[in-house]
């Protein structure tokens, strides 16, 4: 059952307001090495939390971890202000069930660039969290609390950064970092199904895009990902840079996470010419929603 979160007009006001604050604030504060460090550091933390947390853990369960680190991942990911952890993962599971089909929540093939990039988020019917889709994580009360308090988390992050680093940290480490992380994440939806190469015959138009892979810590190897969603590794070959996977392996080495899923050789090497219709039924059946 989907629980409404906010009116689209309220969300749009906050979204565009953040852009205005980021631009005006950056001009007002100005550039400095401190500003650059705040931007780079906060972006790196956010992007790892989005890609490892929201995507590879909560949406796809490609590795395991403790309940404590699960909460930390969710909290860090929610600093990106991309709505609640359960909302994000539930919608992403829907995307994989219907990728580039009429029911896909953010397909550029079906609705165009602008819809896939950001407009879908403002649609009233997409405002709720479908807890039935994410029952495996919705059973944790602390994650439900985070999910319904996404605005509080966003404000709290801003207050903490302001207290630590002043106006420079607030503007560059919070607002500018958030806006940049937004659009890099959104480009996976809007561009990684349009621009790039196709190694595998997935049932959608997913592409491998090296530039997006660098910016999004490995998420740009999107055709790889749609070919085999169970893997925590999206850069299937050594030359396909996947920063999030490298960090996950380090965390596995120190036992913070475990059972980080790789790519079976026979899956990786099964290169075929693109043919969407031929594999639609197979891909639909392959989307795994873990039992509650």
Locate predicted features.
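Active-site-proximal inter-transmembrane loops
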Residues: 134-142, 198-221, 225-228
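Non-catalytic, topology-defining segments of multipass membrane proteins
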Residues: 1-187, 191, 231-292
């Amino acid at each position: 059952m989907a629980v409404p979160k906010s009116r689209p007009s309220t969300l749009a006001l906050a979204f565009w307001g953040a852009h205005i604050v980021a631009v005006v604030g950056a001009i007002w504060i100005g550039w400095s090495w401190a500003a650059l460090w705040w931007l780079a550091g906060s972006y790196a933390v956010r992007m790892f939390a989005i890609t490892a947390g929201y995507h590879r853990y909560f949406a796809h369960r490609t590795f395991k971890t403790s309940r404590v680190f699960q909460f930390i991942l969710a909290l860090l990911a929610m600093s990106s202000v991309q709505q609640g952890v359960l909302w994000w993962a539930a919608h992403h599971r829907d995307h994989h069930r219907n990728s580039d089909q009429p029911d896909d929540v953010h397909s550029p093939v079906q609705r165009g660039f602008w819809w896939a990039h950001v407009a879908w988020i403002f649609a009233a019917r997409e405002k709720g969290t479908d807890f039935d889709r994410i029952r495996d994580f919705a059973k944790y009360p602390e994650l439900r609390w985070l999910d319904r308090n996404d605005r509080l988390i966003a404000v709290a992050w801003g207050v903490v950064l302001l207290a630590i680093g002043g106006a420079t940290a607030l503007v560059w480490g919070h607002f500018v970092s958030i806006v940049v992380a937004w659009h890099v994440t959104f480009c996976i939806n809007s561009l990684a199904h349009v621009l790039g190469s196709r190694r595998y015959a997935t049932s959608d138009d997913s592409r491998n895009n090296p530039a997006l892979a660098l910016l999004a810590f490995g998420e740009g190897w999107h055709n790889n990902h749609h070919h085999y969603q169970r893997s925590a590794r999206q850069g299937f070959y050594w030359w396909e840079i996947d920063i999030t996977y490298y960090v996950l392996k380090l965390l596995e080495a120190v036992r913070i996470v475990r059972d980080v899923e790789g790519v079976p050789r026979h899956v990786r090497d099964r290169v075929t010419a693109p043919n969407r219709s031929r594999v639609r039924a197979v891909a639909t059946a392959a989307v795994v929603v873990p039992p509650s």
